[in-house]
Amino acid sequence: MKILFVEPAIFLSAFAMTLTGPLTTQYVYRRIWEETGNYTFSSDSNISECEKNKSSPIFAFQEEVQKKVSRFNLQMDISGLIPGLVSTFILLSISDHYGRKFPMILSSVGALATSVWLCLLCYFAFPFQLLIASTFIGAFCGNYTTFWGACFAYIVDQCKEHKQKTIRIAIIDFLLGLVTGLTGLSSGYFIRELGFEWSFLIIAVSLAVNLIYILFFLGDPVKECSSQNVTMSCSEGFKNLFYRTYMLFKNASGKRRFLLCLLLFTVITYFFVVIGIAPIFILYELDSPLCWNEVFIGYGSALGSASFLTSFLGIWLFSYCMEDIHMAFIGIFTTMTGMAMTAFASTTLMMFLARVPFLFTIVPFSVLRSMLSKVVRSTEQGTLFACIAFLETLGGVTAVSTFNGIYSATVAWYPGFTFLLSAGLLLLPAISLCVVKCTSWNEGSYELLIQEESSEDASDR
């Protein structure tokens, strides 16, 4: 008997994703550090390889390393842009007919292949530039955005009531927070006690178990398409794919279409800033004046991941006394405050305190997805999440590339500039959400509007 709980797959995937990020960044950082100069990292050092004295030649050297790491991250992100966009859009769109498991399986295969390649790269000390090729190839199978999009669509398929969608998505965020928090907290100890080789191997094993669970134990609430759809040619399949996306907007009334576009803009602009700035935190913490080691970076990652847990608690409590849109406002403005505080953090204590306003960072992601799911029909959920995932893939890669480029250009004169810029950019989703509020957003009214449009379509037939 198949299981209809996607949570175990999310648990394992979140563990692998959270551990892969800081490990890969610090591995590349050390390789570039050692190849750029005659300096080596000490594996048992209790302090970061970092120089705080600006007059020291080591200080200029580490600034050069920061620039090189940032540029390399930029190259990796760009290499996976096009294949990631195509695969994400196609896989999630066809999931409305072929089931949600298909994109989960394919993206899990890609993640597993990439993690195995990381193990080999680290063990045999291959040129780290080969990571660019693995990113390019792995993106064809989909990425974590594809996986999360399929998981969210899987969950929405099982939720009949609108409030249930918000709570269920918030529970997923809680699970993500629990896993990513503990993983982030332990990531530094993984590096220190096990080294990069064994750490990457653990990631590969967890992804293999995840793939086995999805293949053999996870059921799919969405049935396979009819034989007529299966026998469609490839060109007809693509036409049908884009046609469904076009009809998602065309079939909506003017007011609902405007709201749909506005909410998508809000989600993507917020996603652009939050995802784009995320990799910069580690580089910022490695650099002077903080000079954090791998353990402190793990603590910082754990505090950042705690926002999943606190966001779940916030949604659970706030849902009794306020609407989704008000919760989104709270998340945006607290995140903006955290960005501004981080820009001026010059000590370890200040950096930890700057993490506090990020406690509700995940709230807008959950409630905005829930709001979007309420303005489309149940048969359009897969197409909607395909659009979201496609835009998130495009926005995420563009954001990471943009912020890495900005950080590389500004790290020498003011490393915190990127965080100040992020705080300013968060005004865009805040203003967009204000416009949504001015359109008299009401969850019940849009539910009735969708029902009326559906009845009109039925009568036309």
Curated annotation (Swiss-Prot):
Listed transmembrane segments: 74-94, 102-124, 134-156, 171-191, 198-218, 262-282, 295-315, 325-345, 348-368, 383-403, 416-436
Gene3D superfamilies per record: MFS general substrate transporter like domains
Motif Tyrosine-based lysosomal-sorting motif: chain residues: 446-449
Residues in the Cytoplasmic compartment per record: 95-101, 157-170, 219-261, 316-324, 369-382, 437-461
GO biological process entries: cellular response to 2,3,7,8-tetrachlorodibenzodioxine; vacuolar transmembrane transport
MF GO annotations: copper ion transmembrane transporter activity; symporter activity; transmembrane transporter activity
Protein name: Lysosomal proton-coupled steroid conjugate and bile acid symporter SLC46A3
Superkingdom of origin: Eukaryota
UniProt signal peptide: 1-25
PANTHER family per the UniProt record, alphabetical: LYSOSOMAL PROTON-COUPLED STEROID CONJUGATE AND BILE ACID SYMPORTER SLC46A3, ZGC:174356
Membrane topology field: Multi-pass membrane protein
